[in-house]
Amino acid sequence: IIITIEGGIKMALDEIKYQTYVQILKEELVPAMGCTEPIALSYCASKARDILGTTPTRCLVEISGNIIKNVKSVIVPNTNGLKGIEAAVAAGIIAGNANKVLEVIADVKKDQIKEIKDYLEHNCIIVRPLETEHILDIKITLFDDDNYAMVRIVDQHTNIISIEKNHRVLFSKENKICNNEMVIDRCSLNVKDILEFANIVDLNDVKEIISRQIAYNSAIAKEGLTNNYGANIGSVLLNSGQDIITRAKAFAAAGSDARMSGCELPVVINSGSGNQGMTVSLPIIEYAKELNVNDEKLYRALVLGNLIAIHQKNGIGRLSAYCGAVSAGCAAGCGIAYLYGADYECIAHTIVNSLAITSGIICDGAKSSCAAKIAASVDAGILGYKMYLDGQEFKDGDGIVVKGVENTIRNVARLGKEGMKETDKEIIKIMTNC
């Protein structure tokens, strides 16, 4: 594709890669209500109830450690403050609409909230850790008299690989998430091509998804700043100043304040995470307001930021002991740099500098402190950019930093996916009092 952009510069991007990047954005930037892991439980439970054909009297919930970690402490939306695994499953059984996928419990009625609570009080929901090689693994079996239905989700929040009823396999597919076309597409991501794509993309190809991200994520950030949610990190930040850096951190944190506390507003996610979707987008949106840039510049900055976040997470994986906000905050710094006219060298240095600062932050599940980690990660993204402007950088050999942005990204992926496996196990043991 050859497209003339502002100033008459012509840039080319392979047609296949262009369409791949568009499709990645369409697949990743989808709306979800509530923290994604509990919603995945609700979705799985709702699907199993549909297969069973009646409300179950018993439930067996078998889940991987990272699902336990990310559901244990978070409030399930539309449940009047119910928290945890059993609440997410009960909400899916009583009020879920599996056809709405990650918005499965978006339309819970008031009388259904009481039904959810009654169900939790009068029915047996057994939760067991699942011995599995998959970081994200959900297996829910629902029983009623002599009938049962089972649904299993693996590797991605909506990836159903097995449906069974009364010993009959209704649906089964070999799980090829690690080798399928979608993940191969993500492996084609690299910083240089992402920047080129952001410069030349026909905005008609991405306008719908980016405009939805702006609208949804801005709305929940405003909600988080207006009302009392979690530890109110967004409001705490704004109480200390109103400069643009503080606002960028505060709006991202405020969205997380609300989301982690069960706010019913949807969020456009990134890499399977609402917190990451807000972290990468809201600082860029705030800077665009400050700089009074046009919509086109904002959209291109968000395209860049979202794809850089996805690029980093592709190597780390959906769930890890590595805090995903770090990747998203780094990507936000890149989007902000783009608003100022950054070139490839600037973007590359922003990434390396940022990752050198905050890559040690752990993920200990979804809960109110995520908002503070988001603020720290956004701050690192902005600092990484400002370091470059001042001629400063972290150099080859400074810890995990090596020469070349792609090499440093690979090191971080290795750290998050392989190096922190034992850390992840210990975090889960601590959180489950084992």
Regions found by a protein language model. Name each.
Residues K117-G262, I427-C434:
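Signature of multi-pass transmembrane helix bundles
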